[in-house]
Amino acid sequence: MTLNIKNHPCFNDSSRHTYGRIHLPVAPKCNIQCNYCNRKFDCMNENRPGITSKVLSPRQALYYLDNALKLSPNISVVGIAGPGDPFANPEETMETLRLVREKYPEMLLCVATNGLDMLPYIEELAELQVSHVTLTINAIDPEIGQEIYAWVRYQKKMYRDRQAAELLLENQLAALQKLKRYGVTAKVNSIIIPGVNDQHVIEVARQVASMGADILNALPYYNTTETVFENIPEPDPMMVRKIQEEAGKLLPQMKHCARCRADAVGIIGEINSDEMMAKLAEAALMPKNPDEHRPYIAVASLEGVLINQHLGEADRFLVYALDEEKKSCTLVDSRQAPPPGGGKLRWEALAAKLSDCRAVLVNSAGDSPQSVLKASGIDVMSIEGVIEEAVYGVFTGQNLKHLMKSSQIHACKTSCGGDGNGCD
C-alpha cells in the first residue's frame, strides 16, 4: 500500500489542522541523560516534552489505539516518542510498530529518537514502512555536546564528557545516512539552548542538510526544574526566529512544533481530552495482553500480611482479585510454587501456575525468572509493604514508587536522571 506522507501533521504544516497524531508511550527507559531533561515522566498536569500519565505494553498500546481512533478518526499518524528513547526499549518499540502496521496498513508510522541505538533497526523500520523518523541532534561539535549530555550508556557501558558526545554524534550521523539510504523521511530536531548551542545550531543545520535531512526543527529549549540547566532561561522568540530564518537557507524548517508530551493525541496544539486520557488509563489497567483473561495478582509473602519474600524462596503464592465494585481486593487462592532447582524449567512451570495473573509482587527476584515470567505476560514487581495496599494499587493503576525497591525503579533508565549506573 502506498502511504500518503503528506498527511503527517508534524512534517507538513498544511496538514496540522486537519489530521491528528497519537504518541503511544511504550518506551520508558532512556540511554542518555540530557542536562535539560527531568526523567520524572509520570504526570498529568505538566505538558513538557517527554511527560506521560501512563506507560503501556505493545498490546495495551494497540488496545488504546483502537479506542482512540473511535474518538478521533482523523488520526493519521502513530508515533513512538518516549517517555524515554524508543531504541533504549527496542523490543517494545518494534513490537508496537509491527502490531500497528498489521492492523492498520494505511497508518503512517514514525519514531522520535536520539539516534544512539537506532542503527540495527533501520532496515526493519523501512520494511514496516515507518515513513518518518525524527533525530534530535543538538551539536556536531563534541566540545559543545559534552555540555549538553551528562552521560551516554551504550552496549551496557557508560561514557561521559567528550567521549560520550563523540559516540553519540557518530551514531546519530550514521543513523541519518542509513535512514536516507532506505528512503525514510528524516527530520532533525535541534534544541536551542541559550549560552550553550544557540550559536551552533546553524552548523548543525549545515551538516545534516549535507547528509540529506529533509527538514529541521530548531525548537526552543524548555526550562525544567530539577535539571542541570534549570537556571538557563528559555530563548526569546526573536532568537528562535533568527535561527530558523538562517537555517531555512539550508533546508526546510518546521515552525509549528508544540513540544508534545509522550502521550500526546489529536490535533497538534490541542490539550489531550479527558475522555482520551480515560481510555489511556483504561488500557494501562488491562493485562499486558488485553486479549488474555488475567484477573489476578500473585504475591510472595512469609506470613500473608507483607510482601517480604524473594521470588525464588517462596514455597507458595497468594492470589488476589479485585472485587466487583473495585474498592478493595480479596484473597482467592494459594498456589504451591514449583520445587527448587531446574533452572529455566522451574520458572516456566511457575508461569504456567500463574497464567491467569497479570503480575507477581515479590520482595526481590533474579534476572532469569523475571525474563521468563515477562515473556509469559506476567510482570514481576519488587515491592515492600502491606499486601492489600500494593495489590489494590497495581489493579487500579496507582503510583507505587513509595513502595518500590530501588532496584525496581532503575533510576538511570526511567524515572530520574540518576548517574547511569546500576541499570541491569
From Swiss-Prot:
Its cofactor is [4Fe-4S] cluster. Pathway: Cofactor biosynthesis; Fe-Mo cofactor biosynthesis. Gene3D superfamilies: Aldolase class I (3.20.20.70), Dinitrogenase iron-molybdenum cofactor biosynthesis domain (3.30.420.130). It is an enzyme of class 4 (lyase). [4Fe-4S] cluster 1 binds at residues 30, 34, 37. Its EC number is 4.-.-.-. This is FeMo cofactor biosynthesis protein NifB. It comes from Chlorobaculum tepidum (strain ATCC 49652 / DSM 12025 / NBRC 103806 / TLS).
